[in-house]
Amino acid sequence: CNSKGTPCTNADECCGGKCAYNVWNCIGGGCSKTCGY
């Protein structure tokens, strides 16, 4: 599984079971989902 901070599309990719938008990834206009947030 992927560690916290790793880009993801689904929660089941992540060790912590969370895949969500992180506000810091939205700076510059392009939001991306990462594991663990």
Curated annotation (Swiss-Prot):
Pfam families: Toxin_21 (PF08091). Its main location: secreted. One of its GO terms (biological process) is envenomation resulting in negative regulation of low voltage-gated calcium channel activity in another organism. One of its GO terms (cellular component) is extracellular region. Expressed by the venom gland. GO terms for molecular function: calcium channel regulator activity; sodium channel regulator activity; toxin activity. It is found in: Secreted. Keywords: Calcium channel impairing toxin, Disulfide bond, Ion channel impairing toxin, Knottin, Neurotoxin, Secreted, Toxin, Voltage-gated calcium channel impairing toxin, Voltage-gated sodium channel impairing toxin. Disulfide bonds join 1-15, 8-19, 14-35, 26-31. Negative results: does not modulate the activity of delayed-rectifier, 'A-type' or BKCa potassium channels. The presence of a 'disulfide through disulfide knot' structurally defines this protein as a knottin. The recombinant mu-cyrtautoxin-As1a potently and voltage-independently blocks voltage-gated sodium channels (Nav) of insects. It acts by pluging the outer vestibule of the channel. It acts in combination with a weak (30%) voltage-independent block of insect voltage-gated calcium (Cav) channels (low-voltage and high-voltage channels). Tested on DUM neurons, it inhibits sodium currents with an IC(50) of 540 nM (and a Hill coefficient >1, reflecting an incomplete block at higher concentrations). In vivo, it induces flaccid paralysis in adult Australian sheep blowfly Lucilia cuprina. Belongs to the neurotoxin 13 (insecticidal toxin ABC) family. 01 (Aps III) subfamily. This is Mu-cyrtautoxin-As1a.
